[in-house]
């Protein structure tokens, strides 16, 4: 009972369609073949599992049955040697423990203070009124915030321009061709490798300086410096650099993209903007102007607005695993398929998040679908909403991301009126992390919320 295979030239047919865009391919074949189908790409076979009925094994399997390492090894030149997908599962789990420690609630509390301070400083430079590209502004604010919370005070205060330029070269060195040929000697890859070497030198200097002076900071860099493996070994400078790069890559684009989509939808649908503003007034009645971790956690309306933007536009449109054992799946219609070991297995948040049997009017922006009484993502069971992945490999940075986006939009809702003046944006399907095409131009006007006590 093998999955149906898409028709076409057996070697390059699937590759050509895949490179033209995975979402049109998935949309066409889901309609024709159903939620389980195989796409031959060169010598590999990618089997798609679309929807919670068939994707549970993808999310819940042990690493020995379904692994990330082989399919994400293209990240190794970017992250560097000795971290994440360049190490075996046991070491990778220990490194993920370092991430978990760096994202604990007590750490998040200190990060929120830094997020709020960065937002206040950034938007203080805006005038009384004006027109800005919201996408550009939020991209810049989020890299500033990430520099402060993740990379540390030294980078934020003294080396920001240098480090930003180097990360830009790393970023531009991750192209669709990089997934298949990560070491291809092209100019973008050469610039990527040079940037990675220079970043290692910069962070080695900072780490040595911190250790020599005995100073300790409230940032992710410090968490990684202080981390130890179970055998007592300290992290090396190279490992710390690689883990920081991985953290920034995981969070920077995804947060700036989602912040921008959240704003675009709030400005398009004024009833939700009004609800979000009203929520801010209620919060301010209780807490005044103060913003901290616990106060942000009270903002359910804003949370649902962000979550719905992320449902419609997950920046990671495909998740991949390498299958090391045979397994079977059963569709909700009762059809069974056997997937052999050796296949790459894929699912797509961008497509699965819009399945009409899970989400009512799936292409509509409706944050209330997550409100008490509806909770469409829970009614359909686990793995219905997969913008942050799920199961054994759910996104460790989910709480950080929500706090960061909430901190930004809390400040904006309290201090500005907006009007979207460019056409509503579209997805930029050409990017590895799917962002927003073109500018998102908005008029802003400064104002203060008046709260009736």
UniProtKB/Swiss-Prot annotation:
Protein residues bound to heme: 395
Q: Provide the membrane topology annotation.
A: Single-pass membrane protein
- Enzyme's top EC category: oxidoreductase
Entries under SUPFAM superfamilies matching the protein: Cytochrome P450 (SSF48264)
Catalytic activity of the protein:
a 14alpha-methyl steroid + 3 reduced [NADPH--hemoprotein reductase] + 3 O2 = a Delta(14) steroid + formate + 3 oxidized [NADPH--hemoprotein reductase] + 4 H2O + 4 H(+)
Q: Which cysteine pairs are joined by S-S bonds?
A: none
Q: Which cofactor does it need?
A: heme
What EC number(s) does this enzyme carry? Answer: 1.14.14.154
User: Entry's PROSITE patterns?
Assistant: CYTOCHROME_P450
Similarity comment text for this entry = Belongs to the cytochrome P450 family.
For this entry, the protein name equals Obtusifoliol 14-alpha demethylase
Q: Which organism is it from?
A: Triticum aestivum (Wheat)
């Amino acid at each position: 009972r093998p999955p149906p295979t898409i028709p076409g030239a057996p070697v390059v047919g699937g590759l050509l369609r895949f490179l033209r865009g995975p979402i049109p391919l998935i949309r066409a074949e889901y309609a024709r073949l159903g939620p389980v189908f195989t796409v031959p790409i060169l010598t590999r076979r990618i089997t798609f599992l679309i929807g919670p009925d068939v994707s549970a094994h993808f999310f819940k399997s042990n690493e020995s049955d379904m692994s990330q390492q082989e399919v994400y090894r293209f990240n190794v030149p970017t992250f560097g040697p000795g971290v994440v997908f360049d190490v075996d599962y046991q070491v990778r789990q220990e490194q993920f423990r370092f991430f978990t420690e760096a994202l604990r609630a007590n750490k998040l509390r200190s990060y929120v203070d830094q997020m709020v301070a960065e937002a206040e400083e950034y938007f203080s430079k805006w005038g009384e009124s004006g027109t800005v590209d919201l996408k550009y502004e939020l991209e810049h604010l989020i890299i500033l915030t990430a520099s402060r919370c993740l990379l540390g005070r030294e980078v934020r205060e003294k080396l920001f321009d240098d480090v930003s330029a180097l990360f830009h070269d790393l970023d531009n060195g991750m192209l669709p061709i990089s997934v298949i040929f990560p070491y291809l000697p092209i100019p973008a890859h050469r610039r990527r490798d040079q940037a990675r070497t220079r970043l290692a030198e910069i962070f080695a200097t900072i780490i040595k300086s911190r250790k020599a002076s005995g100073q300790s900071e409230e940032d992710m860099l410090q968490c990684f410096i202080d981390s130890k493996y179970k055998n007592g070994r300290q992290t090396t400078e190279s490992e710390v650099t690689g883990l920081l790069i991985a953290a920034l890559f995981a969070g920077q684009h995804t947060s700036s993209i989602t912040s921008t989509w959240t704003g675009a939808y709030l400005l398009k649908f004024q009833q939700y903007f009004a609800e979000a503003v009203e929520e801010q007034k209620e919060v301010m009645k209780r807490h005044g102007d103060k913003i901290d971790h616990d106060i942000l956690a009270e903002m359910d309306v804003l949370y649902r607005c962000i979550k719905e933007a992320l449902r419609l536009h997950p920046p990671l449109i495909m998740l991949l695993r390498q299958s090391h054992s045979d397994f079977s799946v059963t569709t909700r219609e009762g059809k069974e398929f056997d997937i052999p070991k050796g296949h790459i297995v894929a699912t797509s948040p961008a497509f699965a998040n819009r399945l009409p049997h899970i989400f009512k009017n799936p292409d509509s922006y409706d944050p209330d679908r997550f409100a008490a009484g509806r909770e469409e993502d829970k009614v359909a069971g686990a793995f219905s909403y997969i913008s942050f992945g799920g199961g054994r490999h759910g996104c460790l940075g989910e709480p950080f991301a929500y706090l960061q986006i909430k901190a930004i939009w809390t400040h904006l809702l309290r201090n500005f009126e907006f009007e979207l003046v460019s056409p509503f944006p579209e997805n930029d399907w050409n990017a590895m992390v799917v962002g927003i095409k073109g500018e998102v131009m908005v008029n802003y006007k400064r104002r203060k919320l008046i709260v009736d006590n």
